[in-house]
Each structure stands twice: as C-alpha cells, then as structure tokens.
Amino acid sequence: MSKTEKNALDLLKGAYNLITPDDNKKYYEGFAPFYDSVFVKDLGYTYPTVVANLLVEKFTIDGPICDIGCGTGLVANEIKKKAPNAVIDGVDISQDMIQISREKKLYRNLLELNLEDHLDSLLQDYSAVVSAGTFTHGHLGSETLKRLISHFNSGTKFVIGINFDHYHSKGFEKQFKALNETNIIDCFELNEVKVYNKDNKNLNIKNGKACVCLFSKT
C-alpha cells in the first residue's frame, strides 16, 4: 500500500466516526483541500460516476437536478460529461466542500444545509434528485431520507446511494418497502454497486459496496 493510499484510508476511517453536524463540518474542513486528489484518485472512488451514469441512463431529465451532499462536485462533473446542458443545484453541509464546487463552476446554485434542519431554503421543483455519499456513514438515517423525499414535488425522480450494510441494518430497506406499499413512491429499482474500482481486499476498505435506489415520487 502506498503512503497516499494509507493517508486516504486514515481519512476514510475518520468518516465512519461522524455523529453530529458539527463533526461533519470539522471533518470536511480538513478533508476538502485534497479530497479529489487523495481520496478519489488514490482509493479509486468511482461511486459518483456510477450514480451519475444511472441517473442519465435510466431517466429522462427535463428540468433542474438537485445534488444532495454535493461535496466537491464529483457527481455533477460526471453528469455534465453525458448531459453538458444539465442545470444542477448543489446542497452540502460543508462550506469548505461547497467552496471547491463553486470554483469548478458546475452548479447553478449552491446551498449550505444540514438535512436534519428545516428544509425551507431548499427548492421543491426539481426534475431529479441525486445523491452519492450522503447516506454512507450512518449519521443520517431512513427517517431523514423519508423527510427529504416528502419535501420534493410529485413526479420527481430519485437516484439515491446508500451504504450497503446500512441499507439492510439501519431501516432503509424497510422504509422503502413502506413508501412503495403506501404509494408515496413507485418504479422502485435497487442496484448493488462497487464504491471503488480498486481491490478493496488489498486496501482493507470497509463497506466497499452501496445500494443505489432509483424511484419516482408519486
């Protein structure tokens, strides 16, 4: 394992200890400057590419897209490769990550927001909502996702990535079943994907898979 891979892994381990919104802000304050160069490059973090491709390939997007937990703009960058004219707004809890996104000029608007707070400042009228990495570390649960889904207008399409273990152990699977059975969402599709394109066994990465959920709000 290279030194840069080890540094990236040390940072990744820290992410799974995040509990409060302040924990997240402090963590990404230190992570933001080299998130792309170390974490993405050295660990082969391809999750944003997978999520963006599913959005573009599975849905017809005829309006603005909301990128929840936009970070440094990795998902938006991949969407723009296939849909250069896409209009994307980004939402993230970390002002430091948002600043890097802003410099890339990928987004129409960028909003600093804690998803556990009121969502009044978040627009409701989006063609699609996409997220890769927000529901990963366990601090945001299925009830937060349910509240987020309810915020957006009927007809909104969703591509939401969730940590594989947490999907099954922290109530997401049951939540989606309930949402589907009560006709709050429809056209539900589950995709199990790899988060990294490198050998997770050699890198000793936990949680190397994710469940990407595609659905529409009725």
Where are these regions (language model features)?
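N-terminal, positively charged/glycine-rich alpha-helical extensions of SAM-dependent methyltransferases
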Residues: M1-F34
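Conserved beta-strand signature within the Rossmann-like core of class I S-adenosyl-L-methionine
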Residues: G155-F164
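Conserved alpha-helix/loop element of class I SAM-dependent methyltransferases that forms part
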Residues: G44-D62
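Class I S-adenosyl-L-methionine
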Residues: I184-T218
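A short SAM/SAH-binding and catalytic strip from SAM-dependent methyltransferases
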Residues: E116, S127-G141
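A short glycine-rich, Lys/Arg-flanked "PGG" loop and its adjoining helix->strand segment in the class I
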Residues: E143-S154
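Class I SAM-dependent methyltransferase Rossmann-like catalytic core
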Residues: A32-T46
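Class I SAM-dependent methyltransferase SAM/SAH-binding core
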Residues: C66-L119
